[in-house]
Structure formats: structure tokens, C-alpha cells
Amino acid sequence: METEVKKIPYLDLKAINEPYEKEIKDAINKVVNSGWYLQGEAVKKFEKSYAQFIGTEYCISCANGTDALKLMLMGELAIGNLQKGDEVIVPANTYFATVLAISSVELTPVLVDANIDTLQIDDRLIEDKISPKTKAIMIVHLYGKLAWTPKIAEICKKHHLLLFEDNAQGFGCSTTLSDDSQNTSEPLSKRRYTGNLSDAAAHSFYPSKNLGALGDAGAVTTNNKDLAEAIMALHEYGKIEDGIFRYQGVNSRMDEIQAAVLNVKLQYPENEQKARHRQIQLYLEHLDDDIKDRCIAAKLISPAHENVFHVFPFLTRKRDQLKGFLAENGVGTKIHYFRPPYLQPCYPEMNHLEFPVAKRIADEELSLPCNSSLNDEDIIRVSKLINQFLV
């Protein structure tokens, strides 16, 4: 009789949330029993706690990460820092929602190719894309890897550009800054978290994120009071007081249950990150050296605090075959993302563009299991299977 092979899922959300199960249930019951399900104490507590964690003056919660991106841009439009038709530079290999948020508020996304060593926007290519219409750069901490660089901050300062962060995948990621090159007036001399490296940042708490809710949720962080006040109004129809609407806004609110869940998990910000870093080290120990050299981006791993490994991207020309082989052996994987935004049918005006690194990533990237629901034996087994297939 054959022994059944243990399945290794790409992500087991139930298992990830089990350590917090009692606290989460208690927090949800408290909300249910309160009779107050929107704009209550749980949301207020989360906004205050999250701003403190990120290090910003303001946090405005909303319904999801895509809304956070849109509200951030809508806020800048509302206070006059952006005008419709302005260009926003954005990485070509980002998730579709980043580009969608820009175009949906009548701004123009201008794509820049990625750097194959970091898988982030290539800061060497940005200035060639700047035109008189360029007013902002949107960096994306894709896969949980820091996208901010001193050069990007210098470009923003030189060309008087706003800097935005899509921090949907970057919770807990940080960098050590020692100069005043950030696009603000404040000198920097200590470590800062992503979400506080720019004029404003959008965050997602989709269940699979490193800080995940039990449904959709998002937020914007900023140190700009005028922007924060505009977003506070915009996310509730544009209302500035009962019955008075300054803007044509949207209805995008985080509910009390999601806030209660996030308040529990925000008490343990290191748990998921530590598990993922340990597993990355196991992959590095057990994957063959030549495979690591060929398939792991050269600057992906270190320094440790600059990557929280929301995704562990593995590059191989045999991506589809490896994915199938791992599936046959009970290992779940994902692809982030097989068709980049500029090749999507809803952007026909971009379909002719060429971004060779972004296209290579789209063709070769395979996301390997890496999260707190897995144990050491799981990671070692996945590594051995990869070695076996790519020998």
C-alpha cells in the first residue's frame, strides 16, 4: 500500500490564523455584541495603531487596497497637487490594480521596466520617462521587497515630483535612511517602514497578505494633513460634515469586524516575518548552488529587513513544467503575474510596448510556498523536488 504524500499548499489561511483564533473570535464577538458595525471603536483603534506602527501622522482606513490606491490619488487631485491628465510613473511588472487605480481617476500611467537583480522598478530608467506632464512616481514594494532607493528620492526632489508607495505587499518591510534625500523636508537617521517613505502610501489587508484581515480591507498612510483630511472626506462620499459634501467621493469604509481582526494580528507583527525569513534561509541551504544562481534574483535576499517575502519569486524558463511537477508531488505554487498590465486587453494603447525584463518575469516567475503555516520539513522537501527537476 502506497504512503500518501503530504500535500504542501501554497497558502493555508486557516492555519495561518489559528494562533490568533481565540483572540479573533473574542474580538468579533465584542463587535457583534456592541451593535456598532461601521465607523466604531475598532476602526478608530486600528487607524491609530497602524499609523503608530508605520510611523506616520495619519492613517485612513478603507474597504480594500485598490480603493486605497485610488483614494490616495483622488486626495491629491482634490487638494490640487495633481490635475487630470498628469502622468504617474509606475513599474511595468506590477499587479494590475496599481495601474488601474491611476487610469481610473483620469491620470496617465507611464510604465518603466524592472531591474532583474531586484525585480523592482529600475531607477536607472526613470528619468528617460519624465516629461513636462510627469507629476509623480508610484513605487511598488512587489513581493515584499523594498522598492524605495535613494536615487528615486533624488529624482523626485530634482524634478519636483510626488512620491507614492503601493505597499499592498510590503507590510513590515523597512530600510535604514541616513540622509535627507526622502521627498519630504524631514532629515532621516533611523530605520523607517514602507508606508512612511513617501508623500502617501496605500496598504492592502487582503486575507493572504502578511497582515491579513478575514475579508477585504485597506488604508492610506501619510504625514500630509491636507491630504489626510481630503481622503477622510472622499472615502465617505465626500462628506465633510453631516449633510455637507465637498467632493464627489466614494463609499469605501473598513468595517468593524475587519478592524477588530487586524487589531489582534497587529499585536504580533514579527510572527509571519520571522517564519518567512527562516524558510528563505532553508531554501538557500537546500537548493543546489547553481539553481540558486540561475533562479533567485541577485539582490532579492539581503539585507533581511528590506524583504518580508510576501512572495518568494523563483525564476526559471521551465516555469510551467516545474509548476506541474510540483503539483504532481502535492506542492502548491502560484504565478505573480503571468500577464503584466501593459499586455492586458483593457489597455490596447499599451499592448505594443516592450519591457523585456517585465516580460521575462511574467514568463518565468513561480511563487514558492513560504509562510507560517509550513514547517522546516515542508521547505526542505520542496527544495529537494526543485533540485530533482532542474538538475
Segments the model singles out, each with a brief description of its role:
Residues 36, 40-87, 100-105, 111-113:
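Phosphate-binding glycine-rich loop
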Residues 105, 158-159, 329:
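Helix C-cap/helix->beta junction micro-motif
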Residues 11-16, 25-45:
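A glycine-/small-polar-enriched, mobile loop at the entrance of the PLP active site in fold-type I
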Residues 117-213, 219-221, 367:
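Active-site phosphate-binding strand-loop segment of PLP-dependent enzymes
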